[in-house]
């Protein structure tokens, strides 16, 4: 890969031959003109010295024409060169996304989202930085070749002296290439790790906040950032070592040529004009030589980035697409023939599974969490290929079938209802984008989501936000079901499709499903007894083995494990009594103390929020000392660079014209000393700037991330999560890049301008007026450029965040996109966003291409004016030839910093946009305040006082006038239809959100007055969205209490019934879990979440659908543990399954965001209202007479 990455990149560049030819052609022509201009200068000076009054007007016309041609050629070179960079970056990004869309399950398990983000952003930017200079490489090489040719024509001895340093420069460049490549690659790997920490914390933000672990996540980031800091410092040291050295060697060569050329001119071997022309050529070549040396550094960084991007592009799925299409008409059978499979070699998850589903039959597969049900579904949809055996659909091995024909026949309802950004209608029609509104409405009606949609102001055009997290779990699940039904599949695979809906809605859905699957093959992976009414046969899985297959009655009779899994929860009344005496329950005064003691991880310094109205500015002030030292060294370096023209003037006027060779030698020696001093100062400046820049980056990233962690959940909705990831990664780097390089360039430019203007005024004030004639034009052009480019950069920055958000979304929902053959539409969406970003980049490049060459044009015009008028004054004896030469050299130096300032403005714009975004983020109010009340032990009284709440993305309020008082120690179950506001109530108690109106009080105190972290440390929360961080199973359980012992972790797992599932995993509690728990089933994740909440021993327990992914047997264990845990502590439970509601102290029924019923179980049943209907449906669904279950009329 490393050996051919340049060839691969050149292949991408060659896709745009027209742009390449135009850019190279303009570079070639511009180089020829630039090399020939010094010959014109030679002629003008020689004519001036000869004082023969030859007309200079023709040469003026030539110089002006050359300036105009150079402007046009520079515009073409810059525009098309930049356009190539943006086009290639877009091509690489699209190829990387296409590779992502091809991934099978194993590739998806291999790549983390952090790696994806870094490789498609930071690494691509490194490649783009090099591609911007592709035409410049040819220009510089041509300049060197033509320059050497011209210098050889002017003077062979001087030319030989000039090229002596080339081998030395080549050796140093080769050594720097080897060292920098390894260092940069290492730094990029650490950068990916940092991005991975940020992305995981953003994805799992609900879990982070639930357990008050914001500071812990910040510590993770600080730890990863320290490793990145060390790696980046090594790169900075190497750059400081090689960069100044490679730039100093050409300057030493110039001093050598000055000494020898001056001696030859004094001896009459060459004319003064020849010497000046040679010096002009050498000066012209010094810049390309330095630039090429700098490009070597950029090239090594770009190479490291290119290798990583190409690795992503070259990633291939392990499975091979078949060649046979699946018959489009026949009904399908599904058969597993002695199937064994493991995610890791020698660790089978499924063992010798032989199972068949006849065409038109419905098979239900039941099993405990971790038994292999979801893995079996993944094999049917061919996310993975079996290790042994075969999976056959319609009698054909799925490995022989084309993926497109296979997946077109399958409809999938996954256990995790993944939605995509867009509207509700677009998500329902995800598998059939050509569906009519009537077809979408029919599918929605079948999934019982239509009523909810009709309450929304925008109906089916309502945006669901990123991953649909603004909707309730039941609403997302019903949209996923409607999506599968609209697809009209011949084989329907459903993984607990109604686990998050209430009993009444489930009955209605079952009636629709019974009709929908009547003429098609269906496989239902379920933990719910009610879904078995749809099945013709049942298969029982346990620990990856098939225990039994048959009709529900047959299996019930002969399979003890089946009866155990589906046995309804026993009467839990006795458990309530036992719970009162249980030794695991502590007195109220002791509850929650360990959670508070063991989760307050403190890492002082790097993430303390700087106070004040402008926290970003205050933060940067902390580095005033190092930054001032860096800028002082830069100023010294710049002043040293202004001395050579004065020394040259002295050498020409005294050493050459007056034949005082000692003056020439002293000038050359002083110039050499100046170059050496400048090299030392430049090295020191680079070291200080490198260290300071990395320190600022470390600090800024930590502060921004820590502040983002403290924001409310609403900041992470829509594409807010992607924008936060961009702020912590790309935006902070843009600011520091400007401080490290742009600010240095600004200081150099300003010092240079001031110094040159002083020198020019001292030499000949009158000629300065000629230069000033161009300044108003330059100022007007700069203002116009700044105004036009500012809008472009802001839009481009926002669009980059959208590109990143789309990438993250499809990385998370890739299996759904593949299952519904939506890869091409995903590619189109990503292409549209990436192409918008590309077009904005090209627009910005056009502005740059218009502006920078215009600065060079003004410089050429000013040089022409000074040269002509100065030559006239030389003839008149007003100024010396040396003064004129010095003037011309200073003019070149004068407009160079102006151009660099303009170029620096490009970096400034990027940094300014990034700073604005970060300033806005840091200025966003956090739920906690400095005057927040510290939280001690909580009794647990919860009061909702006229509480209203509306989500930002919805006009319909989620809660409307909630008035409830929950005494301390009471267990309350919230029930109601999906979307009625139950989860929102839990989130308000957890203070994920603050009420729009009204107050939530705990122990008589408004939650907004509490220290939010201290308060959450008193809670135990299980959210609907299960998330675990990468690490071991033990780490996942101990997330809310990191210092818990192994015995305490195991005890928590046993108490919630998770221990058998964990011990069945490879390595048990040390089993490695991927970020988000992608290698675990929903049931396994839910058990870990329950154990996690149990371990913190909370004062208030909040459970939001904590058992929806569990089988009845495991649910019974969990419910007993919940009742034990709930004794003598306030417990709020959101439940669709009503088994636990019967034994709660109180039941609250919500509908449309209001409380419609409130009372005990027996009271509400006697009332005959909403709860009575829910209970009747629940009772029917959970009846032991499985074969006789009938859903009531919803």
UniProtKB/Swiss-Prot annotation:
Efflux is inhibited by reserpine. ATP binds at residues 367-374, 976-983. CDD domains: ABC_6TM_Rv0194_D1_like (cd18543), ABC_6TM_Rv0194_D2_like (cd18546). GO terms for molecular function: ABC-type transporter activity; ATP binding; ATP hydrolysis activity; ATPase-coupled lipid transmembrane transporter activity; efflux transmembrane transporter activity. Residues 21-301, 628-910 form the ABC transmembrane type-1 domain. Its EC number is 7.6.2.-. Residues 334-568, 942-1177 form the ABC transporter domain. The keyword Ribosomal protein does not apply. It is a multi-pass membrane protein. The ATP-binding domains (NBD) and the transmembrane domains (TMD) are fused. This is Multidrug efflux ATP-binding/permease protein Rv0194. It comes from Mycobacterium tuberculosis (strain ATCC 25618 / H37Rv). The lineage of its organism: Bacteria, Bacillati, Actinomycetota, Actinomycetes, Mycobacteriales.
């Amino acid at each position: 890969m490393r050996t051919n990455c340049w060839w691969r990149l050149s292949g991408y560049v060659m896709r745009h031959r027209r742009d390449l030819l135009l850019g190279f052609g303009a570079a070639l022509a511009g180089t020829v003109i630039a090399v020939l201009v010094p010959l014109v200068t030679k002629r003008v000076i020689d004519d001036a010295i000869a004082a023969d009054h030859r007309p200079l007007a023709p040469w003026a016309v030539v110089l002006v024409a050359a300036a105009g041609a150079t402007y046009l050629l520079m515009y073409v070179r810059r525009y098309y060169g930049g356009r190539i960079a943006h086009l290639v970056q877009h091509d690489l990004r699209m190829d990387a996304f296409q590779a992502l869309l091809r991934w099978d399950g194993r590739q998806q398990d291999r790549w983390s989202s952090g790696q994806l983000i870094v490789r498609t952003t930071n690494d691509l930017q490194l490649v783009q930085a090099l591609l911007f200079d592709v035409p410049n490489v040819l220009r510089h090489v041509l300049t060197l070749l033509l320059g050497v040719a011209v210098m050889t024509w002017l003077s062979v001895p001087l030319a030989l002296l000039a090229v002596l340093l080339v081998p030395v420069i080549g050796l140093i460049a080769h050594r720097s290439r080897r060292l920098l490549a390894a260092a940069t690659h290492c730094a990029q790997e650490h950068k990916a790790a940092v991005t991975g920490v940020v992305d995981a914390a953003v994805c799992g933000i609900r879990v982070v906040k639930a357990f008050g672990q914001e500071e812990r996540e910040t510590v993770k980031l600080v730890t990863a950032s320290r490793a990145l800091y060390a790696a980046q410092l090594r790169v900075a040291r190497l750059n400081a070592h090689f960069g100044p050295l490679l730039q100093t060697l050409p300057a030493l060569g110039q001093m050598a040529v000055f000494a020898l050329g001056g001696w030859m001119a004094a001896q009459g071997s060459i004319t003064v004009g020849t010497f000046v022309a040679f010096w002009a050529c050498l000066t012209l070549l010094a810049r390309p030589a330095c630039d090429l040396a700098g490009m070597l550094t950029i090239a090594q960084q770009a190479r490291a980035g290119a290798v990583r991007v190409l690795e992503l592009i070259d990633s291939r799925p392990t499975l091979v697409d078949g060649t046979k299409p699946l018959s489009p008409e026949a009904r399908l059978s599904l058969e597993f023939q002695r199937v064994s499979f493991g995610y890791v070699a020698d660790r089978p998850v499924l063992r010798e599974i032989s199972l068949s589903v006849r065409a038109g039959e419905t098979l239900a597969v039941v099993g405990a969490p971790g038994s292999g049900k979801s893995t079996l579904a993944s094999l049917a949809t061919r996310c993975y290929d079996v290790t042994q055996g075969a999976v056959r659909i319609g009698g054909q091995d799925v490995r022989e079938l084309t993926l497109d024909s296979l997946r077109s026949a399958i409809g999938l309802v996954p256990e995790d209802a993944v939605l995509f950004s867009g509207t509700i209608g677009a998500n329902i029609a995800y598998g059939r984008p050509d569906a009519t509104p009537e077809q979408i409405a029919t599918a929605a009606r079948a999934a019982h989501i239509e009523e909810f949609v009709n309450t929304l102001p925008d109906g089916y055009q309502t945006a669901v936000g990123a991953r649909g997290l603004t909707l309730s779990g039941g609403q997302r699940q019903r949209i996923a079901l409607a999506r599968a039904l609209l697809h009209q599949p011949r084989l329907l695979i459903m993984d607990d499709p109604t686990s998050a809906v209430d009993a009444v809605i489930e009955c209605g859905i079952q009636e629709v499903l019974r009709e929908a699957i009547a003429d098609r093959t269906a496989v239902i992976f379920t933990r719910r007894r009610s879904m078995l009414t749809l099945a013709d046969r049942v298969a029982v899985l346990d620990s990856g083995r098939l225990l039994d297959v048959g009709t529900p009655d047959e299996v019930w009779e002969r399979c003890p494990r089946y009866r155990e899994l589906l046995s309804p929860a026993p009467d839990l009344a006795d458990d309530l009594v036992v719970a009162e005496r249980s030794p695991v329950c502590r007195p109220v005064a002791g509850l929650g103390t360990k959670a508070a003691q063991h989760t307050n991880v403190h890492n002082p310094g790097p993430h303390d929020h700087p106070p004040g109205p402008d926290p970003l500015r205050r933060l940067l002030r902390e580095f005033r000392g190092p930054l001032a030292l860096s800028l002082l060294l830069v100023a010294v370096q710049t002043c040293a660079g202004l001395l050579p023209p004065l020394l040259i003037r002295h050498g020409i006027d005294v050493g050459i014209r007056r034949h005082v060779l000692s003056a020439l030698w002293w000038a050359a020696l002083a110039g050499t000393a100046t170059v050496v001093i400048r090299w030392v100062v430049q090295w020191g400046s680079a070291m200080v700037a490198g260290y300071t820049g990395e320190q600022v980056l470390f600090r800024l990233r930590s502060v921004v991330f820590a502040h983002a962690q403290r924001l409310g959940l609403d900041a992470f909705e829509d594409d807010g999560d992607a924008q936060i990831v961009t702020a912590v990664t790309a935006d902070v780097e843009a600011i520091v890049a400007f401080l490290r390089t742009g600010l240095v360039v600004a200081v150099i430019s300003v010092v240079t301008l001031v110094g040159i203007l002083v020198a020019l005024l001292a030499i000949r004030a009158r000629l300065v007026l000629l230069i000033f004639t161009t300044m108003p034009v330059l100022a007007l052009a700069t203002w116009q450029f700044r105004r036009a480019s500012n809008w472009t950069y802001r839009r481009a920055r926002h669009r980059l965040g959208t590109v990143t958000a789309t990438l993250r979304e499809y990385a998370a929902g890739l299996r759904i996109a593949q299952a519904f053959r939506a890869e091409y539409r995903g590619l189109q969406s990503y292409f549209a966003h990436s192409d918008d970003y590309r077009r904005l980049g090209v627009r910005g490049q056009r502005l740059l291409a218009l502006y920078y060459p215009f600065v060079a044009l003004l410089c050429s015009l000013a040089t022409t004016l000074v040269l002509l008028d100065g030559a006239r004054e030389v003839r008149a004896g007003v100024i010396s030839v040396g003064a004129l030469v010095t003037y011309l050299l200073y003019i070149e130096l004068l407009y160079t910093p102006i151009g660099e300032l303009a170029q620096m403005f490009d970096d400034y714009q990027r940094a300014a946009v990034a700073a604005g975004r970060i300033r806005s983020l840091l200025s966003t109010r956090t739920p906690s305040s400095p005057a927040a009340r510290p939280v001690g032990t909580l009794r647990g009284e919860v009061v909702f006082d006229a509480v209203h709440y509306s989500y930002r993305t919805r006009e319909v309020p989620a809660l409307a006038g909630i008035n409830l008082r929950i005494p301390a120690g009471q267990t309350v179950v919230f029930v109601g239809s999906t979307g009625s506001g139950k989860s929102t109530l839990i989130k308000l108690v957890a203070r994920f959100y603050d009420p729009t109106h009204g107050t939530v009080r705990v122990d008589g105190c408004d939650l907004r007055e509490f220290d939010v972290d201290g308060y959450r440390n008193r809670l135990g929360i299980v959210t609907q969205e299960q998330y675990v961080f990468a690490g071991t199973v033990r780490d996942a359980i101990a997330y809310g209490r990191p210092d818990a012992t192994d015995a305490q972790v195991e005890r928590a797992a046993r108490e919630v019934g998770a221990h058998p599932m964990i011990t069945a995993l490879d390595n048990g509690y040390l089993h490695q879990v991927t970020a988000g728990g992608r290698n675990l089933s929903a049931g396994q994740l839910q058990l870990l979440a329950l154990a996690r909440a149990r371990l913190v021993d909370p004062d208030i327990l909040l459970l939001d659908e904590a058992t929806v992914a569990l089988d009845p047997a495991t649910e019974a264990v969990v419910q007993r543990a919940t009742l034990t845990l709930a004794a003598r502590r306030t417990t709020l439970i959101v439940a669709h399954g009503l088994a636990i509601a019967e034994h709660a102290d109180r039941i609250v029924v919500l509908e449309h965001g209001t409380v419609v019923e409130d009372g005990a179980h027996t009271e509400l049943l006697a009332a005959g209202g909403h709860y009575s209907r829910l209970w009747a449906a629940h009772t029917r669904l959970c009846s032991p007479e499985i074969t006789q279950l009938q859903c009531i009329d919803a």
